[in-house]
Amino acid sequence: MDTSRVLLSAVFLISFLWDLPGFQQASISSSSSSAELGSAKGMRSRKEGRMPRAPRENATAREPLDRQEPPPRPQEEPQRRPPQQPEAREPPGRGPRVVPHEYMLSIYRTYSIAEKLGINASFFQSSKSANTITSFVDRGLDDLSHTPLRRQKYLFDVSTLSDKEELVGAELRLFRQAPAAPWGPPAGPLRLQLFACQSPLLLEARSLDPQGAPRPGWEVFDVWRGLRPQPWKQLCLELRAAWGGEPGAAEDEARAPGPQQPPPPDLRSLGFGRRVRTPQERALLVVFSRSQRKTLFAEMREQLGSATEVVGPGGGAEGSGPPPPPPPPPPSGTPDAGLWSPSPGRRRRRTAFASRHGKRHGKKSRLRCSKKPLHVNFKELGWDDWIIAPLEYEAYHCEGVCDFPLRSHLEPTNHAIIQTLMNSMDPGSTPPSCCVPTKLTPISILYIDAGNNVVYKQYEEMVVESCGCR
């Protein structure tokens, strides 16, 4: 009973004191002092260089962001240049793969068919009795400073021509496109004239009909006279057009046209501009030459030499690794036998080729001398990077024994008959005569030379037609 009264009295006393203003101010001042104490501690920590400790989860979340490096800028990506590597299937030391001109392909097809029919390609009038035809693609640009185009220059790098070759002809082939707009009223006869650059020498001139729109086609100019005096490094030819029938009408082009003299026609309107042209429509210089037999395979030596000089055994630049091992020595009595050896980078292919085609030579055949098959694949030899066509052909070879008596179809020489007779009497004293080719025929090869020019060449004595004892 006394306890309940004491508790009730305490409650009334507390409520009475809470209503007094002095007690409320004391409580407020105590709470504010605690707040000021907290703020003072915070300011003191800032002055001393210490930041208030944040919650742990915030620190751990922010710490990886502070340590993480900023990502690279997107615009910096294109500035990174990948290491330059030669493209696949490109011959060493060359530029991009050369696309043969359709004109050179047609020459190869025509002369190859003639050879199969037994006709020598050098007898064709178009070949000019040449066994080598080299094509050079125009490297010039349009002269944009002259509008309209009055003169068109054509530049050709002819440094790969050898002074050992006899030059028998040269022609410039220009593709004339159909004009985009019809011609205006004719001002007289229209003539095309071809000059050597920086020279008044007129190589050839021809007339065009100004009445009708010309059809697209090839204009062929004889430039043999312009190529002969050149030092065979670079040939520059210039095409002009003029109104008039005189051969030197184009020379009056530099004069200011009078009231009765129309300006020279625009070569672009005649279809001779370089813009919007396919590779097959570019100007082509075709040189006809006749090579001596001893220099027919000189380009093979150049091909193998340029490949070993430019690229090392590991595919890197020159000097990046140890030099390649020397090629095997040629067989005795065989001149330039190393020309038929594939490049160092093709040795695995050569080994496979030899193991596949050399099994029949393990045992000496006792058959009489006759012609046997021999299939040659230039791709297996490693020459497909510069030989365009053919990639393979049937060469044949001679195999067998020349025993006594010799057959008449073997066409033996008197010396072979005596040698065979001596061998039959005493095999230890005299070796038998040899089974060798007695008649060989040529083949046509289309290839890329060291200057990336497409060349047609007729190679003599490439196919065995008959065998005999010698």
UniProtKB/Swiss-Prot annotation:
Pfam families, alphabetized: TGF_beta, TGFb_propeptide
Propiece residue ranges: 23-350
Keyword Secreted: yes
Predominant location category: secreted
Record InterPro entries: Cystine-knot_cytokine, TGF-b_C, TGF-b_propeptide, TGF-beta-rel, TGFb_CS
Compositionally biased tracts (Basic and acidic residues): 45-80
Subunit structure: Homodimer; disulfide-linked.
Protein known as: Growth/differentiation factor 6
Protein species of origin: Bos taurus (Bovine)
Gene name of the encoded protein: GDF6
